[in-house]
Amino acid sequence: MCGLAGIINLAAPRSQECTFHILKGMADAISYRGPDDEQYHIDSKVGFAFRRLSILDLVNGQQPFLNEDGSIVVMVNGEIYNYKELKASLHNHMFKTTSDCEVIVHLYEEKGIGFVDDIIGMFSIAIWDKNKNKVFLVRDRFGIKPLFYTELKHELIFASEIKSLFSHPHCPRQFNWKEALSDIWLSGEAASNHKETTSFFVNIQNLDAGHYLEINLTTNERKTASYWSLQDILLRQGYRENLHPDDLIEGYRELLADSVHRCLQSDVEVGLFLSGGIDSAAVAHFAAEKQDLHTFTVLSQSTFTNEDAKYAHWLAKDLHLPNHQVLYQLGNDELLQPESYKHLLWICETPFCGPEQLYKFHLHKYAKAIRPNLKVMLTGQGSDEFNGGYSTTLSPAENPSWEGFIESVNTMEMNRLHRLQGNIFRVWEEHFGLSPINLSYLKSNDSSQADPWQSYVLTKYRDLQMYNCWHEDRIAAANHIENRVPFLDHRLVEWVCGIPDGLRKDLLWDKSVLRKSLTNELHTSYTHRPKVPFFYGKDVRYTHKMMFHLLKKNNYQLIEEAFSHSDASSIIQVEHIHAIMTYLEDDPEFTNFEFLLRLVNMGLLSKMTKETPSVQLDITSHLESITIKDWHSQEGDIASRLNISANKCEGQDILALNPGVTLLRPESDSEHCIYIAEEGFIQFIVSEEDVGAWLHILCDINGKDTLHTILDRHGVSLEEVAKYIQEAIEHNIILIKQKNLPEGAYR
């Protein structure tokens, strides 16, 4: 994990002193990416700045690297996992360090830009070849390491982060509202997306994964080229047609184990984010084969109720690894300060910022505070995208199968093609509720020609670059930590993408290839555990409630700052934002809150872009963790610390309305709803359309009958209404009376 910045003069060069002054500002803007060292290389045409986080060869690994005669200058942000093999293949070269990245300068000498085909790793690279008078900017195959650039009047500048570019006096600083508001994922549209990646800032380019930019300083010609194409890999999908499924599974296991082991190479401490799911469990298992490492888990209301935290505790115990359960409490001011959220948003530099980033930022911060020598963190990112992790989520409830998943993917692809053609055919679908136009006809004007699965994978590939890798890099870097992702070893991804069409159903439904590869490695309680979202799912309301209260803080400070300036006020109707907030406050589920937060993020970024605030790391304050020795015996205490009601309703319990609550029925029976009043004021509306049978159960609560009795009267199971009962308890609408307690004694 390091920070790059550079200036390439395309016309008459400025003085080296002036270049250094500008480069210094660009490097300082991302100093947290490299707190251990700061180096510069400047000549008449090119200036490089490097901020180093030292992980291998702590003493001598300064960059930029030069070849023997100084004609080639290289900066590398990332890790070259096969550097030892590459180094052994390079003869007659003088290596000055034992850093993994120094191998690049000599590999380029031998092979030119084709060197990149030999690398296993994650990287963004800048090469200044004085002999050819060319500069190359190179990015790894999945965009794990960031690299942005912009062309100015007489120069091209590049950096690891956008905020570094903004430090250049001539760089445009303007948020791209049109790009953000029309982004398919930001708006939540259910469509495939194969568009090039974007930065969401005007004239700032995001160098796509698997690409390099070549700048010829003799002709000033610039060209971008692909050296690795996921689409080409997918189009070769039959090249493992002759392999037996067992061989595909075993090959996958071997590659994953090798990738995890390579990701452990370090001269400093390595840690692991342990979620309780199959992905981080796999990484933890293979990592534990080689070394002991501390694991870190989010312990929140959501991860408690979806049992992620519990399974993480159990797995760490089984693997004999220390596990830190980091406590996220709803009312914790450390989490919920507008200024700290703006700090996080500026770290991320994208509207895709929310609770996931908040949780992970503080998890990194905690890890750094209690383990100061920890500089590397392993995560399970990238498994879902290529192993079929979202297949169960995307398949419809009425058809939870691979076929149902493909049906949903087809719909997403149809929506993408409609978009490409300006929605000119969508009116036919609107007439009938389904499209009479053949998907193959829509595809006839689309150059990608991908089948549904391929289209889906290409969409997730873009998502990785725009969301997963982007955030994991920024949040780790802001805490002086490098994030490593074993599932994004290109050999592993190519292996999965080579699974023949006929075997996808068996190996890519619910990540079967991963689960089956661990059959002899982990207990079935881990390998067969269903996928649960990090904080989404049935208890996402806890997280949305936390973020909602953040927006309300200090009299709606974040909303006022986001939309009061001229750029935002001309685009967003602020009064409607406040109306949405009022609506959400009355919605126990805080439905679609994340889309409101993204709009607020856009407004804040638009404002902060003009201010370019600095990013500083402060680990003097951090969240606390809970020491858990036995989950079952401590479960009640854990729930109490999380402010989760211990009053889980059971069938033998007797329910009663809170004495201050009144249920009001509308005059017309056709409305099928009731109004819930507290102390004479209507607070909630409960509609049968929204909650189904719960409406009738609520009306039948009388303080005398057990819940089982009421449920039996209506032919309803406890599972159908348990969520609504818990919500009603949390909002003090109903109380629980246990049998054999005195009259009026409730809990």
From Swiss-Prot:
Keywords: Amino-acid biosynthesis, Asparagine biosynthesis, ATP-binding, Glutamine amidotransferase, Ligase, Nucleotide-binding. The gene is asnH. Its EC number is 6.3.5.4. Coiled coil: none annotated. ATP binds at S395, P396. It catalyses: L-aspartate + L-glutamine + ATP + H2O = L-asparagine + L-glutamate + AMP + diphosphate + H(+). Disulfide bonds: none annotated. The active site is at C2 (for gatase activity). The keyword Ligase applies. Pathway: Amino-acid biosynthesis; L-asparagine biosynthesis; L-asparagine from L-aspartate (L-Gln route): step 1/1. This is Asparagine synthetase [glutamine-hydrolyzing] 2. Belongs to the asparagine synthetase family. InterPro entries: Asn_synth_AEB, Asn_synthase, ASN_synthetase/amidase, AsnB_N, GATase_2_dom, Ntn_hydrolases_N, Rossmann-like_a/b/a_fold. Residues 2-218 form the Glutamine amidotransferase type-2 domain. It comes from Bacillus subtilis (strain 168). GO terms for molecular function: asparagine synthase (glutamine-hydrolyzing) activity; ATP binding.
